[in-house]
A protein has these predicted regions:
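Short-chain dehydrogenase/reductase
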Residues: 1, 41-45, 75
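Short glycine/proline- and charge-enriched loop/turn segments
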Residues: 29-37, 88-92
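Substrate-positioning beta->alpha
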Residues: 12-16, 25-27, 35-57
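Amphipathic alpha-helical segment in the mid-to-C-terminal domain
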Residues: 48, 78, 116-120
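Amphipathic terminal alpha-helices
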Residues: 123-128
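Mid/C-terminal beta-alpha module of Rossmann-like enzyme folds, strongest
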Residues: 52-108
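Short beta-loop-alpha junction of Rossmann-like oxidoreductase domains
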Residues: 22-28, 79
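Conserved beta-loop-beta element that borders a ligand/cofactor-binding pocket
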Residues: 1-22
């Protein structure tokens, strides 16, 4: 907010969730780890294809100013998601602490108001 309020030129800010695709995924860093916190928190991820598509839509729509969160509308719980992804990719399962914790679900729907933009990336990488 400070940056966007203090500049006198056009500025579009894209705030990305955790970036994923077939070759880039946070489970590779979490595999086999123990005592991970916040099992009931939600994941806020975005697929690479959605980032590319959002940039193209912003350019095509001639947007010069704005702040956009790019986050998949799918927000599974951390323990469920990372455990399933580790199993799917045949990696050692992560272990989560049994705690309630807090979570923050980031909304990425503002970008969907642009002509032609719809989230298409699959954060489950076709697991489901």
């Amino acid at each position: 907010s400070l940056l966007s309020d203090s500049v006198s030129f056009d500025l579009v800010i894209l705030r990305l969730g955790g970036l994923i695709d077939q070759d880039r995924h946070p489970i590779y860093h979490l595999q086999g780890r123990k005592d991970l916190s916040d099992p009931n928190g939600v994941v806020n991820l975005v697929h690479r294809i959605d980032v590319i598509h959002a940039i193209k839509c912003l350019i095509d729509s001639n947007i010069h100013n704005g702040l956009y969160n790019l986050v998949s509308p799918d927000h599974p719980k951390r323990e469920e998601y990372y455990t399933k992804m580790a199993g799917f990719l045949k990696l050692e399962l992560p272990e989560f602490k049994k705690e309630k914790g807090n979570y923050k679900e980031v909304k990425g729907d503002k970008i969907t108001q642009l002509q032609g933009f719809k989230y298409q990336g699959d954060i489950w990488l076709s697991l489901r």
